Amino acid sequence: MHDENLLQLINDDLAPAEQLLGLLQDESIALKGRDMQVLENILARKQSLIILLEQHGRRRSEILAILGLATNRSGLESLASHSSVGTQLLSQGDVLNQLLAQCQAANLLNGQSIQTQQAITANQLRILHGGEAPSLYDARGTTSMLNKHRAYSQA
């Protein structure tokens, strides 16, 4: 009974995990295009999927814990060894783990992209406000001064 419930939870998480992966890929494209409206929509949808996946993950862990098993792959293997749906449990669990690993990798890349864009924006603002490094040149070809503030039209 617990094994079938666990299998159902795993199967129920496959579609949301695939949707999350698709959203993360869309987010990557939107980040490159700096499309804020699309990013806001993606964020809202991402959050609901993450909440759902976390809830199901906790339920799966609770089922394994109730049975006195480890709440990881070895616990799932122990349950599968005594279950009529054991091979399905392991195979679907592997599929879900692979999807979630892909989601984590895509999310990491998106995070790095955000950090890069933040650094670029901060550098651009520093240049606009006259705080650029002395190795940069002004319109006359002379080395600009570090703390020289100027109007935006002169930047």
Protein language model features and the residues they cover:
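Extended, charge-rich alpha-helical scaffolding segments
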Residues: 2-81, 91
